[in-house]
Amino acid sequence: MPFLLILFTLFFCWLFCGRYGVFGSKVDWISQHSVFPDYFRQQFYDTGDFFPEFAAGIGGGQNIYNFAYYGLYSPVFLLSYLLPFVKMSDYLIAASFTCLASAVVLLYFWLIKRGFSQTVSFLTALLFLLSAPMIFQSYNQIMFVNYMPFLCMALWGVDSFLKKENRFSIYPVYF
């Protein structure tokens, strides 16, 4: 069933936006949401400073933490630092799809762990995928949904913590 959910995610991403062009909007996504993480990454390559304070190339120079909204230390974007040969726009397409698919699959497994049947868990995860913000925001305003896999892991971790199965499983909550 998880493989089927990934296929549905791929199909619906293609159906709703991929067949009309790129999995990413031509407004905010290409002008802001791929540009700022690429700037953060380039600044890291240029300075080697993981915690810079000043961004000289943005707005005449500003405190870089003014742009934390664009995912300055997001785990999703930090992985791109390891891939200097990949264009940020291509990376964001892959990362957005991966976040969406993993959130759907993690929700499915969390529901099964909570005692729901496979059918109910599958249909709920499919409805979650088809909810208005998930696919739309994945290719328009990625920062509104790229936290969803971490939220699903946090739900799983809180359940384990409350059942005292594993005290260390609460750590995804802090991301």
Please describe what each predicted stretch is.
Residues 1-14, 125, 171-174:
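Alpha-helical transmembrane segments
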Residues 9-104, 126-149:
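Membrane-interface coil-to-helix junctions
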Residues 17, 80, 108-112, 159, ...:
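Membrane-water interface at transmembrane helix exits
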Residues 101-109, 151-156:
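Central hydrophobic cores of alpha-helical transmembrane segments in multi-pass inner-membrane proteins
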Residues 107-130:
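Transmembrane-helix signature of polytopic, membrane-embedded enzymes
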Residues 119-124, 142-147, 169-173:
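Hydrophobic alpha-helical membrane segments of integral membrane proteins
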Residues 154-170:
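Membrane-interface transmembrane helices that cradle and orient dolichyl/undecaprenyl
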